[in-house]
């Protein structure tokens, strides 16, 4: 009788043991944490920029390249920035290379002499619609420079090239006296904080007069005169 009376208790014990086995910590239904997707590799965008000096007697200072998404290096009729003034008066491009608007920048090596060319590579990640600006001083002048101002690159595909011609500009920061004391390339002063050009704004350059043309105090000869365009710029997207 006792055995028969204990059957319900035995059943309860078996059921309890079975249920406890279901919660032994090995829950195979636990959701797996998904692995994070790897970050995509950055898209490297590369350009080769070749600058040809088309003048007869004007060396170009170290060429400055800047990639940016907004802004311009200069505006006709407006004062030049100090960074541009330094390039136009002395060829010093250090300030221009680190402008706040620059997403990437590069500099040529040394002078690009008349009839010669220099190729510079500039790289940027994940941006295919940047603007390219280029600047260089016409070395034997008071404050003449040439370059590109915010040239859009969105339509330039890998393997394609564009060729553009650039004119000479006057930074409007130094009077065009052409005398030896004011032109660094002939032994005079380069950059000066004093702006003695009454216009104080960027304009198209009127050209060189020179001693051969009757300006007795000029340190320049007819060889340093120039016509537009003064440079040819070829932009190739290589990557």
Task: Go through each PLM region and give its residues.
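C-terminal motif of bacterial Sec signal peptides marking the signal peptidase cleavage site
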Residues: 18-21
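Extracellular low-complexity, O-glycosylation-prone Ser/Thr/Pro/Gly-rich "stalks"
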Residues: 55, 61-63, 77, 87, ...
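Bacterial N-terminal signal peptides that target proteins for export
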Residues: 2-11
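Intrinsically disordered, low-complexity proline-rich regions
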Residues: 33-41
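Bacterial signal peptide processing site
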Residues: 23-27
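Structured domain cores in non-transmembrane regions
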Residues: 40-46, 54-159
């Amino acid at each position: 009788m006792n055995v028969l009376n204990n059957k319900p208790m035995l059943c309860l014990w078996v059921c309890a043991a079975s249920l406890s086995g279901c919660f032994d910590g090995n829950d195979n239904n636990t959701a797996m944490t998904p692995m994070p997707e790897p970050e995509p590799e950055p898209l490297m965008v590369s350009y080769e920029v070749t600058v040809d000096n088309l003048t007869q007697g004007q060396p170009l200072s170290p060429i400055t390249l800047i990639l940016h998404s907004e802004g311009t290096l200069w505006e006709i009729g407006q004062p030049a920035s100090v960074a541009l003034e330094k390039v136009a008066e002395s060829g010093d491009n250090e300030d221009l290379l680190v402008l706040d608007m620059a997403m990437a920048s590069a500099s040529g090596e040394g002078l690009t002499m008349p009839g010669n060319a220099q190729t510079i590579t500039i790289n940027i990640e994940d941006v295919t619609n940047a603007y390219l600006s280029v600047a260089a001083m016409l070395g034997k002048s008071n404050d003449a420079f040439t370059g590109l101002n915010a040239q859009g690159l969105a339509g330039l595909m890998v393997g394609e090239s564009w060729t553009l011609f650039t004119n000479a500009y006057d930074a409007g920061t130094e009077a065009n006296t052409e005398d030896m004391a004011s032109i660094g390339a002939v032994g005079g002063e380069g950059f000066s904080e004093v702006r003695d050009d009454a216009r104080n704004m960027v304009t198209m350059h009127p050209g060189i007069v020179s001693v051969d043309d009757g300006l007795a105090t000029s340190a320049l000869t007819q060889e340093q005169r120039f016509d537009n365009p003064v440079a040819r710029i070829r932009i190739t997207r290589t990557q």
